[in-house]
Amino acid sequence: MSAKIIDGKTIAQQVRNEVAEQVKQRLAAGKRAPGLAVVLVGENPASQIYVASKRRACDEVGFLSRSYDLPATTSEAELLALIDRLNADGEIDGILVQLPLPAGIDNVKVLERIHPDKDVDGFHPYNVGRLCQRSPKLRPCTPRGIVTLLERYNIDTYGLNAVVVGASNIVGRPMSMELLLAGCTTTVTHRFTKNLRHHVENADLLIVAVGKPGFIPGDWIKPGAIVVDVGINRLESGKVVGDVEFDAASERAAYITPVPGGVGPMTVATLIQNTLQACEVYHDVQPK
């Protein structure tokens, strides 16, 4: 068996095209373009790359994009004051603060300062709580993007045994909630899990997000499984690989996401979707 590749690049482009068309329709109807503010504190090279891709996506779909590149010496109080201004700004529908933040700034305090209806990353306790209560509003980008991939490939998730490897607040925990909504019997594994192999071998749908290259051996994959690899790891050689041994896993899985070109593009595309949603659901004012 050779797995079918889940092409995140193509699906992400479809999503961006759909959003761009909706933006055109808004402008034709006399409405404003959605606005996204992207805040970067410090000069983390990886963060700069991620932020640049988000800004490019905004330009591509016709959003108003505002960039705030702050020095690493920015205080927590200064960052919170900027968020307060953006919360009150009628042109801004989404506020994204790129993580990680420099030492001395409390991530939790900053993310909770963003108003829930501008929280396009989906990290605010209100939005996480809505997801847990089966009534999601703005959903965390990577999990929502993964669900979109499964939907676009017409993969029926109801009744599947789903296993999430990794329990982070950004991917693993909200992913488990999305999988429950999608009708899966869901297991979350983490660093204290005993006999990880047993759980992986029983997974009809496997989501791996630990940030360790080749962490899941390919021969652990259940034949016919769906494998979603969230990991993005750069080796010393410069090659970018995921958390799953791709070649060996591809021989056993029915579907698999590549790295790069799988989940990564969907995270940015979903951020764009969330910003349009925030604009239309929360902030639209009819033209006079």
Curated annotation (Swiss-Prot):
GO MF terms held by the record: methenyltetrahydrofolate cyclohydrolase activity; methylenetetrahydrofolate dehydrogenase (NADP+) activity
Catalytic activity: (6R)-5,10-methylene-5,6,7,8-tetrahydrofolate + NADP(+) = (6R)-5,10-methenyltetrahydrofolate + NADPH; (6R)-5,10-methenyltetrahydrofolate + H2O = (6R)-10-formyltetrahydrofolate + H(+)
Database matches in CDD domains: NAD_bind_m-THF_DH_Cyclohyd
EC number(s) given by UniProt: 1.5.1.5, 3.5.4.9
UniProt keyword Amino-acid biosynthesis present: yes
Entry's family note: Belongs to the tetrahydrofolate dehydrogenase/cyclohydrolase family.
Subunit structure: Homodimer.
Name listed for the protein in its UniProt record: Bifunctional protein FolD
Organism: Serratia proteamaculans (strain 568)
Gene name in the database record: folD
